[in-house]
């Protein structure tokens, strides 16, 4: 009864509806809205797939299905060209849990998620965050978390200046310190 009363007295009479996607694990790792295309959003799930909507969430479609990995840690849209997406695989452990899906590195799409190219960094296992340069979509920083429960020397911050053709680790503390 209290819930109904509070709902009715909400400013602007906001009404929430379930818009999906609904066939997933419910562990959202990343959500990005396209700054250049109103109504276009991407949602990445920790244990399965990347979904896209172009109509403010009324309809969703999976756009990362045929890849050799399930876990996703982050997605980034290039600010200077929103058709360019970077996807970091491997759940990021932003939430406290005992099981996470490992990944296979970083992927790039130049067509809004229709097709994907694998860019390497397979040994990083879990990508926590991706940042794309505001004016040059080929300059990207990736926070690699490595293996969570065993030794891992692939942790650190990686940078590419050529769209993922080559990666350089620009920060590494030790095998116990995740990015």
Tell what function each PLM region has.
Residues 1-179:
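Beta-propeller blade termini and top-face loops
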């Amino acid at each position: 009864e209290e819930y109904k009363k509070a709902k009715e007295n909400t400013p602007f009479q906001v009404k929430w509806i379930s818009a999906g996607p609904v066939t997933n694990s419910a562990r959202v790792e990343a959500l990005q809205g396209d700054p250049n295309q109103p109504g276009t959003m991407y949602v990445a799930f920790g244990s399965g797939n990347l979904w896209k909507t172009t109509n403010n969430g009324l309809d969703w479609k999976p756009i990362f299905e045929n890849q050799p990995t399930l876990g996703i840690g982050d997605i980034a849209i290039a600010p200077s060209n929103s058709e360019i997406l970077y996807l970091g695989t491997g759940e990021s452990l932003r939430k406290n849990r005992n099981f996470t899906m490992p990944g296979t590195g970083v992927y790039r799409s130049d067509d809004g998620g229709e097709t994907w190219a694998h860019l390497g960094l397979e040994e990083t296992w879990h990508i926590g965050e991706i940042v794309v340069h505001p004016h040059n979509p080929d300059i990207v920083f990736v926070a690699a978390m490595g293996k969570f429960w065993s030794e891992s020397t692939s942790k650190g911050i990686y940078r590419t200046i050529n769209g993922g053709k080559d990666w350089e680790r620009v920060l590494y503390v030790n095998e116990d310190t995740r990015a």
